[in-house]
Regions:
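An aromatic-glycine-centered, glycine-rich loop/turn in mixed alpha/beta architecture
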Residues: 95-164
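Carbohydrate-recognition loop of C-type lectin domains
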Residues: 1-115
Length: 164
């Protein structure tokens, strides 16, 4: 699997993420699932799929019996809506900025093929020093992402919900 990751990532600089999935009933049939760094939603273009497929086809790259098929990871869209409740002496704008920086960092790190979005991670990212309470309105629960998908955040709306 690591060799396929290496050759897929080396094929083109636009390859962002890669998962290698082997079918239980036919372990020689491999799905090479990639995402694209410069596409709007992370899905790979047909051109990139062909470039990576060509890079994996030569027999010196793969075992003779392996049959790798390059596929695009499918974007699983979600949005984040949250309210932050601050202390009486807190500087709202600074706390909001810090929470937004941390949630954007989490979104970038989580944009991996097969990476689920966990509410606990969202709470952790949003709960910066000075925030008393975080209420996440969306997503309502964990977002389960399978090996053929990657999470794609379409919008974030983080606001100050009040003073406590």
């Amino acid at each position: 699997a690591n060799a396929y990751r290496y050759f897929a990532l080396s094929a083109d600089g636009r390859v962002d993420g890669i998962k290698v999935y082997s079918h239980i009933d036919n372990p020689y049939l491999l799905d090479i699932i990639i995402s694209q760094i410069d596409s709007q939603n992370g899905e790979a273009t047909q051109e990139l799929l062909q470039i990576v497929q060509t890079a994996l086809d030569p027999e010196h790259v793969r075992p003779v019996c392996d049959r790798p098929i390059v596929k695009s990871s499918i974007a699983s869209p979600y949005s984040i809506n949250a309210r932050l409740f601050v202390g009486k002496n807190a500087e709202d704008s600074l706390l909001l900025e810090a929470a937004n920086i941390r949630i954007q960092s989490y979104i970038q790190k989580a944009r991996k093929n097969g990476q689920s979005i966990r509410l606990s991670a969202l709470y952790a990212a949003l709960h910066v020093d000075g925030i008393n309470r975080v209420v996440i309105d969306a997503p309502a629960s964990d977002i389960e992402i399978d090996v053929y998908q990657h999470p794609h955040c379409t919008a974030t709306n983080i606001t100050i919900g009040g003073v406590e």
